[in-house]
């Protein structure tokens, strides 16, 4: 199988060649931990891509949110079009975890909405890891959560080959055993249907279907096909086999399930006896009723709501043993890349404690067995022990990464020649009037402004005041979802408005070359939002523009300000010296506007589609549904999940309205 093949029109420049060489050599020498300290806009992702090509290791990239993960996924997919680049994040569009509030005696049942396309991408990631070595998986912290055993997932897969003897009923049973459902009407992922001697399977992790044609009890022909058009894509040759992987990550052979059910019953008996001995009759009755219902559902259907809470029994783990996460699907020699490590590592650290705190009340009050504790994310120590080799990527790595790393590789020079922005300190008195003056000067030049405040109230008041002053301004806060955030940034770049006000959302991952001025209000208020690392990250937002500058409004120079200025000036001097030596004139980055995730509002899409449908015949409406399905699959393939979801809802509306 071919290895990683980097495809790019660009050659490494500035500090990139040296960073690539040092990191690659460090990995080849067996260094376990390294830091890539790369300034904003220095091309850290391109550097990492080159390192992956050099060392040829399966790679897991962890980002601290879905937005950054999607951005990295798109970039790596462009760099490695001939390799398996996968996306593994939480598949919930909406998630309300199960919880119990003792103070008000309120039980909150688990409620969730699963994004089917992201679920497919998760399954595709594990499939690629089992089948090949040239795999990059871009993930959020979902990668440390329990997803079941890779050995069972591999062992339960259905392998088919032309000429094999297999009865229809046996094949149906094998598919149902790995969570496929029979559906002779709709071509839904994770389903199969039968027409005479032809069985069509729609794998949960693929966009194509598998057509199995039987002659008696013998497989006569196997081919892949387009689920929308039904046309054959490719025929599986006689010597080759095709593997149909389970439709869910949690799977188990029947004999193992019987053993697991016995283990659950034994734990139930022990816990009920404990509750009764403590005279907690209500809790014991509640636990008995709930657990026995779950056991009956598992016996009859092979599944129950909340089955993951019994995963320790199904996996054969002992109490306290680490769960099987995505990391178990990687080979031992994998490479780990942690993006924005100063944020991502604390996030990984916090996952386990938060999960345990929520389950404590559920277990104490008889809603769950104690084994529910073991359906959990990895602790940080468990995660750390699973690391083979790691690169921590950040413009401001934390003391932890710096302390455990054998090498810190700096990437200070940007390929564009851009230098870190000039930073000015101005008094807090009259900071708003001064800010307005600077905004007007910057706006006249056709540039944009970012303003960061300390509190939500201050951001709202400032936005309102700037609007009264005739300034085109928007406010971005934490309640804004990912899609709307992307649209706000796009509108800022397009010049729909000139100033964006925020609190903590204007730091990592905000790439806006049009921004020439960053204002940090109340910069002298020591704390998380005005720490050395936060200040450096925020100031870095002006580093993609050749005319970029920063103003810190402060009544005094704090230790954080002093340290941030010292580091920024150090980097700036290195960059200026490099440019002078090589005759480089800094040029503002010219970055094309990305397509909008959703081109029209949802309501407009629905009314437009239904309005058109009113004038069509039944056959034309059916054709329209087929076209919309093809468009939905294309949108999902391009990671335009919100558009795909809108199209999916349009299709449902059409089917319901016209009884299709």
From Swiss-Prot:
What biological-process GO terms show up in the record? nucleotide-excision repair; SOS response
Q: Which PROSITE patterns match?
A: HELICASE_ATP_BIND_1, HELICASE_CTER, UVR
Q: Where does ATP bind?
A: 38-45
> The motif Beta-hairpin: which residues?
91-114
Q: Report the SMART domains cross-referenced here.
A: DEXDc (SM00487), HELICc (SM00490)
Q: Mind telling me which Pfam families this protein's record contains? A: Helicase_C (PF00271), ResIII (PF04851), UVR (PF02151), UvrB (PF12344), UvrB_inter (PF17757)
Domain called Helicase ATP-binding: residue spans: 25-183
Start and end residues of each UVR domain: 622-657
Listed A to Z, the keywords are: ATP-binding, Cytoplasm, DNA damage, DNA excision, DNA repair, Excision nuclease, Helicase, Hydrolase, Nucleotide-binding, SOS response
Q: Which GO terms describe its cellular component?
A: cytoplasm; excinuclease repair complex
GO MF annotation, one? excinuclease ABC activity
Domain named Helicase C-terminal is located at 431-593
**What Gene3D superfamilies has UniProt attached to this entry?**
P-loop containing nucleotide triphosphate hydrolases (3.40.50.300), UVR domain (4.10.860.10)
Q: Where in or outside the cell?
A: Cytoplasm
Member of which family? Belongs to the UvrB family.
Task performed by this protein: The UvrABC repair system catalyzes the recognition and processing of DNA lesions. A damage recognition complex composed of 2 UvrA and 2 UvrB subunits scans DNA for abnormalities. Upon binding of the UvrA(2)B(2) complex to a putative damaged site, the DNA wraps around one UvrB monomer. DNA wrap is dependent on ATP binding by UvrB and probably causes local melting of the DNA helix, facilitating insertion of UvrB beta-hairpin between the DNA strands. Then UvrB probes one DNA strand for the presence of a lesion.
Fill in the domain comment: The beta-hairpin motif is involved in DNA binding.
Assembly information from the UniProt record: Forms a heterotetramer with UvrA during the search for lesions. Interacts with UvrC in an incision complex.
Q: In its UniProt entry, what is this protein called? A: UvrABC system protein B
Q: Which organism is it from?
A: Methanococcoides burtonii (strain DSM 6242 / NBRC 107633 / OCM 468 / ACE-M)
**Name of the gene this protein is made from:** uvrB
């Amino acid at each position: 199988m071919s290895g990683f093949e980097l495809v790019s029109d660009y050659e490494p420049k500035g500090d990139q060649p040296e960073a690539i060489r040092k990191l690659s050599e460090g990995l080849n020498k067996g260094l376990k931990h390294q830091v890539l300290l790369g300034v904003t806009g220095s091309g850290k992702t391109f550097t990492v891509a080159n390192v992956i090509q050099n060392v040829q290791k399966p790679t897991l990239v962890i980002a601290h949110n879905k937005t950054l993960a999607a951005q990295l996924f798109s970039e790596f997919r462009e760099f490695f079009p001939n390799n398996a680049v996968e996306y593994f994040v939480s598949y919930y569009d909406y998630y309300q975890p199960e919880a119990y509030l003792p103070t008000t005696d309120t039980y909150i049942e688990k409620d969730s909405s699963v994004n089917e396309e992201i679920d497919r991408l998760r399954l595709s990631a594990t499939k690629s890891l089992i089948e090949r070595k040239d795999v990059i998986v871009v993930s959020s912290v979902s990668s440390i959560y329990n997803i079941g055993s890779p050995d069972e997932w591999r062992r339960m897969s259905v392998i088919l080959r032309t000429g094999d003897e297999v009865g229809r009923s046996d094949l149906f049973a094998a598919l149902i055993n790995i969570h496929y459902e029979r559906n002779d009407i709709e071509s839904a992922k994770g389903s199969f249907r039968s027409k005479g001697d032809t069985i069509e399977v729609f794998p949960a992790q693929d966009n194509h279907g598998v057509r199995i044609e039987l002659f008696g009890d013998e497989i006569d022909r196997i081919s892949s096909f387009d689920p929308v058009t039904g046309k054959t894509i490719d025929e599986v040759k006689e010597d080759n086999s095709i593997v149909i992987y389970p439709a869910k990550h949690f799977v188990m052979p029947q004999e193992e399930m019987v053993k697991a059910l016995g283990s659950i019953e034994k734990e139930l008996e022990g816990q009920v006896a404990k509750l009764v001995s403590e005279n907690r009759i209500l809790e014991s009755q509640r636990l008995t009723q709930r657990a026995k219902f779950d056991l009956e559902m598992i016996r009859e259907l092979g599944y129950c709501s909340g089955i993951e809470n019994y995963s320790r029994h199904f996996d054969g783990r002992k109490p306290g043993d680490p769960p099987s996460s995505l990391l178990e699907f990687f080979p031992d020699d994998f490479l780990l890349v942690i993006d924005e490590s100063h944020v991502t590592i604390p996030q990984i650290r916090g996952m386990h404690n938060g999960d345990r705190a929520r389950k404590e009340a559920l277990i104490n009050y008889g809603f769950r067995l104690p084994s529910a504790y073991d359906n959990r994310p990895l602790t940080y120590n468990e995660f750390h022990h699973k690391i083979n080799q790691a690169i921590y990527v950040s413009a401001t790595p934390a003391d932890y990464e710096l302390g455990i790393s054998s090498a810190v590789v700096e990437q200070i020079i940007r390929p564009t020649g851009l230098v870190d922005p000039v930073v000015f300190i101005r008094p807090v008195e009259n900071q708003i009037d001064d800010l307005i003056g600077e905004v007007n000067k910057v706006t006249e030049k056709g540039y944009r402004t970012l303003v960061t405040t300390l509190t939500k109230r201050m951001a709202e008041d400032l936005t309102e005041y700037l609007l009264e002053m005739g300034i085109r301004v928007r406010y971005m806060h934490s309640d804004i979802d990912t899609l709307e955030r992307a649209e706000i940034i796009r509108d800022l770049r397009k010049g729909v408005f000139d100033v964006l006000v925020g609190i903590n959302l204007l730091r990592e991952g905000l790439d806006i070359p049009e921004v020439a001025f960053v204002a940090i209000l109340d910069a002298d208020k020591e704390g998380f939002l005005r720490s050395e690392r936060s200040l450096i990250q925020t100031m870095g937002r002006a580093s993609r523009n050749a005319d970029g500058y920063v103003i810190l409004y402060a009544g005094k120079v704090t230790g954080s300000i002093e340290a941030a200025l010292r580091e920024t000036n150090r980097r700036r001097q290195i960059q200026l010296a490099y440019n002078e030596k090589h005759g480089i004139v800094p040029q503002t980055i010219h970055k094309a506007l990305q397509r909008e995730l959703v081109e029209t509002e949802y309501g407009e899409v629905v009314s437009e589609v239904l309005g058109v449908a009113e004038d069509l015949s039944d056959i034309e409406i059916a054709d329209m549904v087929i076209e919309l399905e093809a468009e939905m699959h294309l949108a999902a393939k391009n990671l335009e999940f919100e558009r795909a979801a809108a199209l999916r809802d349009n299709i449902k509306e059409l089917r319901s309205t016209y009884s299709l």
